[in-house]
Design a protein with these regions (language model features):
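Non-heme di-metal
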Residues: 1-145
Length: 145
């Protein structure tokens, strides 16, 4: 097992925390757009999902408690979405949630397993399955719009 301090898993947890935190804000912004377009149900969907993303971010941060007060340097890219169209925002959210499920968190889980952090691998796998649900829900609501 690799020392957690020197692991890729530590950095992946921070990437996941950053990604979930940004998703939360993007969904809060999207909820405001939906509100302006009088789409209350879509507004609620974005707010509900934003709260779930916050819960995911907390779970990832909790795994980093041993590094409290330290900085963890990561390199990653995140989407910049400045849109005023609710359908476009739903489609973008669907794509991002799908990528988290299909690629990102599966890869992070595999790395965690390879490094010997099975509990963290399970966390990534569990959250990946939730992200799949998010993607499917965003698609369903987008299709209805």
């Amino acid at each position: 097992m690799i020392n957690f301090k020197d692991s890729q898993t530590k950095e992946n947890l921070m990437r996941a925390f950053a990604g979930e935190s940004q998703a939360r804000n993007r969904y809060n912004f999207a909820a405001s757009v939906a509100k302006k377009q009088n789409l209350a149900i879509i507004q609620d969907l974005f707010n509900y999902t934003a709260n779930q993303e916050q819960a995911h971010a907390k779970q990832f941060m909790d795994k980093l408690k041993d590094f409290s007060g330290e900085e963890i340097c990561i390199s990653a890219s995140y989407p910049a979405e400045v849109e005023n169209n609710t359908l476009t925002l739903l489609r973008l959210a669907q794509e991002h949630e799908s990528a988290e499920h299909d690629e990102i968190y599966k890869s992070f889980a595999e790395t965690a397993k390879n490094e010997g952090f099975n509990d963290i691998a399970i966390l990534f796998e569990n959250i990946a399955s939730i992200e799949k649900t998010h993607s499917e829900r965003f698609k369903r609501y987008g299709d209805m719009l």
